[in-house]
Amino acid sequence: MDTILHQTKSAFEFNFLYVIESLDVNDGDTLTGTELLKKLKPYAEQCKALSTALISVENAQQFREAMDFLRDKAAEGQRPVVHFEIHGTDAKDGLYIKNGDVIEWPEVLHSISEINYASGCNLLASFAVCYGQYLAQFINAGKRMPFCISLGSFEELYEDDLELRFFAFYKELLTSFNIDKAYQALLDADPNMPSNYSLIKADVLFANVIKDYLDTQCSRTALKLRAEDEMNANPAKFGHFTKEQRRQFIKDFRRCEREHHEQYYKESVEEYFQLREHPENKNRFLILDSTDALLQTFDE
């Protein structure tokens, strides 16, 4: 099956643009997903390898069926871009479906992760959804990446603004096939409104999650506190330790934990980037050999 290849780090192939829409005209909504596909039609027609489709969902069951359909199509060889035109909940905890059903972020994350896995780590997921990027807080670096790239906002979105921005984004993407140019087009599309959008690439996200883990759990101070907590929690084993023995235990504890988190890092890299199933991902994504190498990128 033909695909369009975008060549950068976090590169992805796509040959199908799906718009998942769950909006209610009776509640004053404009069918912005429907309108987006209409406006993109001439640009999509120029891409012979690209097809488009609108999937309207009325309730949670239909949403789940749509996600299963996209997963199965990806397994058959499609490389979908999935664009969501759905309300986000006021609680920022998920998607608000047309009939009032709520799909919470962990379920959304699981669904798109399955699509991404089936597509060989090629999923671009875009969210014309209020608070859509809150989904990222549930990502675990020790599990398979849920997408190649995610586009959305941590803020409330407004209909006119998102229409302008996502049209500009997809118009540029279908013209230049460059995700960074497309994102810049989105940022520049509406000078009358502040841009609250973010583009999250899977490899950059992984690096940030690992750095946060190292900073909070594996710093020199954090390891000292954990070693002291272990000794204090086991007086029968450590209560007789001299000051020098306690100091040596802390030193040994740090060394063992550093070896452990290096092993954890290597295992996480293999799982997150799906290197067993897709060894080519080693070259597709920015993957560093060690935690030291990863941390150095934040110092540059």
Residue map of PLM features:
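A domain-level signal for caspase-like cysteine endopeptidase catalytic cores
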Residues: 1-104, 118, 122-128, 222
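Short, small-residue alpha-helix embedded
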Residues: 163-174
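Short, solvent-exposed amphipathic alpha-helical segments in soluble enzyme
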Residues: 34-35, 142-143, 167
